[in-house]
């Protein structure tokens, strides 16, 4: 089918593409907002479909829709949720701040699909019964972010943590020079270093799971301004129950819809925890880049898997591409969080009016963090190789090992020994034999790098 057809809404008639499943209100939004070409993500459209299906079931149970109407709406809404009609959601993300255009887009598409199947329903009077864009869109943010986090991000973080822990066990007895301020410090094992990364990821995951408890609370039922006008008082809880049946996630009605519509504090909180995860990933990525630096003029402690040529002009150069990608994702997520923080402040009186931006940034952050966490695990951490010769050479020349002699020879003599070793570029063991009066056997015991990674007071 080609050409155009005439649709109408409360503002009058409008031309709509002949093969479009949407109607006049969606077309007006397409015409009004040719801004970025960015659309609300697939996960958001999925959530909208699930909400409309749940609302139809709730309204059937409460006696506001006939069985045939509810069944037709549910079938069409679930098809939307399944991704069959994503092309019918063309509205730019930079639109009305309530997301009304996208809510009506869903209502029109679902009504059109129901009509094609033989049941005539109205976008507003039936598909949107008991609802407002002002509670549907915030609910869709909560549902979409919760589902994506549970299905993609949390499993990816679990995989990353497990991968780091496996490498930490493998390298638990391989000592290396520790560093503070990027300067040589007392030794640690690779296993200890990686255990810190694993703990960071575990803590980040726990924080995200805690924030998701609030995201499972839904403002559906608040309708226009939070009072629930034109909705059955039981509607919000009924929708939450139906969503639980559809997704397996224990959604519940928010005690105060006013909170969930006028503010987006739960989304702001979740975004903040995503930013914390991004900071942790940036730290891990930078550590890997430093450890891999070289191979001759850098630290050269590890060799990351070679994934692709690194230069169009320098033959043989290989770069740490995965850690670099991780760092860029982290920067993006931190920027997304800044946008969400500003958007979260835009809840003037009874409604936040930057909801589409919050949805876009939040879902992008969750998605790219999930993807890059798996890449970091599988293409960097699982496969890096330790350059033991380089690591051991640096340990032998590390004058800071003299710290272990402090309880025996005192700080000042230790400092003098360290300075002499550094100045002469000699192993600390050789210099200590000359300056401390300790035997070689005593020094070998006191300066054993692996023993020094176990903490405690040496020399007792």
Model feature map: region roles:
Residues 1-460:
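Conserved, well-structured ligand/cofactor-binding cores
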């Amino acid at each position: 089918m080609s050409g155009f057809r005439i649709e109408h809404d409360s503002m009058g008639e409008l031309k709509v593409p002949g093969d479009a499943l949407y109607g006049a209100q969606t077309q007006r939004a397409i015409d009004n907002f040719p801004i970025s070409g960015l659309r609300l993500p697939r996960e958001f459209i999925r959530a909208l479909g699930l909400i409309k299906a749940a609302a139809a079931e709730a309204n059937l149970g409460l006696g506001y829709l006939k069985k045939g109407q509810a069944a037709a709406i549910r079938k069409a809404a679930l098809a939307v949720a399944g991704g069959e009609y994503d092309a019918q959601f063309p509205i730019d993300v930079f639109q009305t701040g309530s997301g009304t255009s996208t809510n009506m887009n869903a209502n029109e598409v679902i009504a059109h699909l129901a009509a094609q199947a033989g049941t005539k329903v109205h976008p507003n009077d039936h598909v949107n019964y008991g609802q407002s864009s002002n509670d549907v869109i915030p609910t869709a943010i909560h549902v979409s972010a919760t589902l994506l986090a549970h299905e993609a991000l949390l499993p990816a973080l679990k995989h990353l943590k497990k991968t780091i822990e496996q490498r930490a066990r493998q390298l638990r007895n391989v000592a290396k020079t520790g560093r503070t301020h990027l300067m040589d410090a007392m030794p640690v094992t690779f296993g200890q270093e990686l255990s810190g990364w694993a703990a960071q990821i575990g803590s980040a995951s726990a924080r995200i799971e805690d924030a998701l408890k609030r995201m499972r609370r839904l403002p559906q039922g608040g309708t226009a301004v939070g009072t629930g006008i034109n909705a059955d008082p039981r509607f919000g809880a009924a929708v939450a129950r139906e969503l639980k049946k559809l997704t397996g996630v224990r959604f519940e009605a928010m005690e105060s819809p006013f909170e969930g519509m006028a503010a987006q504090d739960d989304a702001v909180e979740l975004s903040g925890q995503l930013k914390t995860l991004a900071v942790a990933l940036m730290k891990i990525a930078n550590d890997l880049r430093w450890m891999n630096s070289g191979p001759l003029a850098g630290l050269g402690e590890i060799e990351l898997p070679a994934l692709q040529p690194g230069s169009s002009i320098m033959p043989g150069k290989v770069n740490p591409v995965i850690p670099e990608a991780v760092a860029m994702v982290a920067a993006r997520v931190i920027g997304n969080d800044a946008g969400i923080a500003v958007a979260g402040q835009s809840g003037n009186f009874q409604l936040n009016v930057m909801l589409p931006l919050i949805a876009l940034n939040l879902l992008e952050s969750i998605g790219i963090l999930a993807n890059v966490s798996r890449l970091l695990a599988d293409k960097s951490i699982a496969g890096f190789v330790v350059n033991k010769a380089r690591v051991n050479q640096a340990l032998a020349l590390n004058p800071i090992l003299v710290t272990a002699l402090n309880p025996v020879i005192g700080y000042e003599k230790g400092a003098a020994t360290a300075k002499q070793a550094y100045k002469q570029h000699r192993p600390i063991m050789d210099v200590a034999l000359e300056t401390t009066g300790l035997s070689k056997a005593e020094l070998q015991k006191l300066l054993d790098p692996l023993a020094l990674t176990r903490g405690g007071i040496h020399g007792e």
